[in-house]
Swiss-Prot record:
Domain of life: Bacteria
CDD domains: ATP-synt_Fo_a_6
Keywords per UniProt: ATP synthesis, Cell inner membrane, Cell membrane, CF(0), Hydrogen ion transport, Ion transport, Membrane, Transmembrane, Transmembrane helix, Transport
GO molecular function, one term: proton-transporting ATP synthase activity, rotational mechanism
Main subcellular location of this protein, as a coarse class: membrane
Organism in which the protein naturally occurs: Sinorhizobium medicae (strain WSM419) (Ensifer medicae)
Protein name: ATP synthase subunit a
Job of this protein: Key component of the proton channel; it plays a direct role in the translocation of protons across the membrane.
Record-linked InterPro entries: ATP_synth_F0_asu (IPR000568), ATP_synth_F0_asu_AS (IPR023011), ATP_synth_F0_asu_bact/mt (IPR045083), F0_ATP_A_sf (IPR035908)
Membrane-related topology note: Multi-pass membrane protein
Gene this protein is translated from: atpB
Length: 250
């Protein structure tokens, strides 16, 4: 099982909890989701609780993260979209922290679970729909009627727009899930090559050099992917929120 590259994604029960025939067990995925929230919140608290006129390096990282998301949201959804800053910032920090924790050996990568990423995506799209109808009423439906479309093509275009909108949770969740899953499997495969070849003595160790180099290179790449996937999720969230704030802008 240790050589199985997919073994690292298995969800295992830590505490079995059954209520009315429904499984509410506390699993390793639950544990690392709690750890992710705790790590992100702890980092932000420790780096901002005693802010100085001259920021420390960690305080600078927190302030840069704040400005990074604030700028992204202003560009993506305008000044009116800033009311969603806590939501977008929390999503970005959760995904980034979860991705980085997943890079630690023997830690569980919660963003490699489609149920987790899909829940985050549904939360985003649900917020867009609820706020869109709350703010604009049925005017929110203008989102599905692009400007300048000939009347004869309007039914087809509206149908395409609705299907495209409803597919957003799928594309948003699968993008994050698939990238994290594929990256960790690839790392495991190359690390397995290193371990297997090293067992054959000096000759095997010589042959393990190339897989070792690839493993180190892929590890660096995965750290970059960890940030990029959190960034992409946040950018797309800002774009979708713009549809709720300005439904008739396209």
């Amino acid at each position: 099982m240790s050589n199985d590259p997919t073994h690292q994604f298995l969800v295992n029960k830590i505490v079995s909890i059954d209520i009315g025939g429904i499984d509410f067990s506390f699993t390793n995925a639950s544990l690392f989701m709690v750890a992710t929230v705790g790590a992100a919140a702890g980092f932000l608290y420790l780096t901002t609780s005693q802010r100085g006129l001259i920021p420390t390096r960690m305080q600078s990282v927190s302030e840069m993260s704040y400005e990074f998301i604030a700028s992204m949201l202003r560009e993506g959804a305008g000044s009116q979209g800033m009311k969603f800053f806590p939501m977008v910032f929390s999503l970005f920090m959760f995904i980034l922290t979860a991705n980085l924790l997943g890079m630690v050996p023997y830690f569980f990568t919660v963003t490699s679970q489609i149920i987790v990423t899909f829940a985050l995506a549904v939360f985003v799209i649900g917020t867009v729909i609820l706020y869109g109808f709350y703010k604009h009423g049925f005017g929110f439906l203008k989102l599905f009627v692009p400007h300048g479309v000939p009347g004869a093509l309007l039914p087809l275009v509206v149908a395409i727009e609705i299907i495209s909108f409803l597919s957003r949770p799928i594309s948003l969740s699968v993008r994050l899930f698939a990238n994290m899953l594929a990256g960790h499997i690839t790392l495991k495969v190359f690390a397995g090559f290193v371990a297997s070849l090293s067992a054959f003595g000096a000759l095997g160790i010589g042959g393990a050099i190339l897989p070792l180099i690839m493993t180190v290179a892929l590890t660096g790449l995965e750290f970059l992917v960890a940030f990029l996937q959190a960034y992409v999720f946040a950018v797309l969230t800002c774009m979708y929120l713009n549809d709720a704030v300005h439904p008739g802008s396209h």
